[in-house]
Amino acid sequence: MKHSVSSMNTSLSGKVAAITGAASGIGLECARTLLGAGAKVVLIDREGEKLNKLVAELGENAFALQVDLMQADQVDNLLQGILQLTGRLDIFHANAGAYIGGPVAEGDPDVWDRVLHLNINAAFRCVRSVLPHLIAQKSGDIIFTAVIAGVVPVIWEPVYTASKFAVQAFVHTTRRQVAQYGVRVGAVLPGPVVTALLDDWPKAKMDEALANGSLMQPIEVAESVLFMVTRSKNVTVRDIVILPNSVDL
């Protein structure tokens, strides 16, 4: 008996995705990739002027939504803003985040508070804003950018690692709560990616990483997200971990 393998369906025609932290890095590359698959995409970021320039370049299926995720009232109105622009929502990607590394004994707790608020509280609040809508329509995908630090404690970034462990806990408890409604929740967990989040890396560490190939490009993450949200509705990709070959974690 012959078995044929059909080509992977990656069409998002008729779907609407919304992505936080979409003005640069992983978020912007995910926006480009989902647009290329036929989706309409709402790019969410606090940098309104930059967003407007980007959507003009990206075309008529890209929409700008300026939101400061550190402001609770703006996050609480997130769904309303998305629906006003596009009329629907199928995919929500909680991608925005901040990075902090270094020894705990030398850290600034005020900086920690800002990082933890964005990576944890704001991300969870975003999901709270959009989740009832997805439950009501009995379909949808929520994706988190959780990074490898969400499953492997990384010694040089304790606070950041802790924030991503919190994200992973939220992802998989929420996933189990909402699966019954046809809503899928998953996380993409990349290793080091060339983005603005690595601006705090010491120059010597960055130069070494670029030289030895231990950094990935954002497109690697974007293609994984596309894979996750285009699977058959009876399948959930709960985690995708992607590492450069030379990263020993």
Curated annotation (Swiss-Prot):
The sequence shown is that of strain A. GO terms for cellular component: membrane. The keyword NAD applies. PANTHER family: DEHYDROGENASE/REDUCTASE SDR FAMILY MEMBER 7B, DEHYDROGENASE_REDUCTASE SDR FAMILY MEMBER 7B. It comes from Klebsiella aerogenes. Belongs to the short-chain dehydrogenases/reductases (SDR) family. Homotetramer. The active site is at 160 (proton acceptor). Keywords: NAD, Oxidoreductase. It catalyses: ribitol + NAD(+) = D-ribulose + NADH + H(+). CDD domains: SDR_c (cd05233). Its EC number is 1.1.1.56. NAD(+) binds at residues 20-43. This is Ribitol 2-dehydrogenase. GO terms for molecular function: ribitol 2-dehydrogenase (NAD+) activity. InterPro entries: NAD(P)-bd_dom_sf (IPR036291), Sc_DH/Rdtase_CS (IPR020904), SDR_fam (IPR002347).
